[in-house]
Amino acid sequence: MQCDLSEKHLLITIILSIFAKEINIDSMVRYPVGIQTFSEIRKRNCLYVDKTQYVYELANDMKYVFLSRPRRFGKSLLTSTFGSYFSGRKDLFSGLSIEKLEKDWTEYPVLHFSLAMAKMGTPEDLFNQINMQLNRMEKQYGLTRDGDDVATRFYNLVNNLYDKTGSQVVVLIDEYD
């Protein structure tokens, strides 16, 4: 007797529902498949290998950090973790190493540039992408556009944010390659 695809799907669904009743689904490990943001991993209670001690050390011992690793090595997740840390999101770090290391949890303005989805064939494409992200950041922080070219706008955004908050500005750049 042969089963067509829909019958196989139904059979698999029935078997899974039987197992789901016997296994506490909530106690199963949730893997963060396709999730690259630290906040989402923590909010969804997904498996997270705690490397926050190194985040703390890099943030407090280095002024500039450049990470160059192969694709799929966790650069975006690490960049997102830095973003949450510098945004003062102590709630996301509950139970992790950094919770014991950090005393102040200062909130800094964070400019997070990501070129992940950008299709750039020309320098003009790159400038357009950066301009779009500058627009988003200016709105996010309630600032008006200050300057015409990318370099001037970026310089003014950093300085205006510093003037507005009195805090150093953190710049994160992801998917630059």
PLM region descriptions:
Residues 2, 8-177:
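Phosphate-binding site recognition
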